[in-house]
């Protein structure tokens, strides 16, 4: 019973800390452009038109690989 109470109190404390930290960090992002570029590069992992490709790996943005080049 004591262990259950300790776990419940710990979870409530951690939740409260998360909420307090989230409120304090609003509007304090310093390098917005850098972050958005990083997100963009992480989300687009496909290759553009004319890049080398393999038929076994579908890594072209267009979805087609003809003669080793993205189409």
UniProtKB/Swiss-Prot annotation:
Q: Which residues carry this modification: Cysteine amide?
A: 70
Any further remark recorded for this protein: Found in injectable (milked) (IV) venom.
Protein name as it appears in the record: Omega-conotoxin-like CnVIIF
- Per UniProt, which keywords does this protein have? Amidation, Disulfide bond, Knottin, Neurotoxin, Secreted, Toxin
Q: Which family does it belong to?
A: Belongs to the conotoxin M superfamily.
Top-rank lineage group of the source organism: Eukaryota
Q: Listed GO molecular functions?
A: ion channel inhibitor activity; toxin activity
State the tissue distribution.
Answer: Expressed by the venom duct.
Disulphide connectivity of cysteines: 46-61, 53-65, 60-70
Q: Which SUPFAM superfamilies has this protein been placed in? A: omega toxin-like
What organism does the record attribute this protein to?
A: Conus consors
Q: What is known of its domains?
A: The presence of a 'disulfide through disulfide knot' structurally defines this protein as a knottin. The cysteine framework is VI/VII (C-C-CC-C-C).
The record's listing under InterPro entries reads: Conotoxin, Conotoxin_omega-typ_CS
Where is it predominantly found? secreted
> Could you state one GO cellular component term attached to this entry?
extracellular region
* Places the protein is found: Secreted
For this protein, the record's Pfam families field holds: Conotoxin
Function, in words: Omega-conotoxins act at presynaptic membranes, they bind and block voltage-gated calcium channels (Cav).
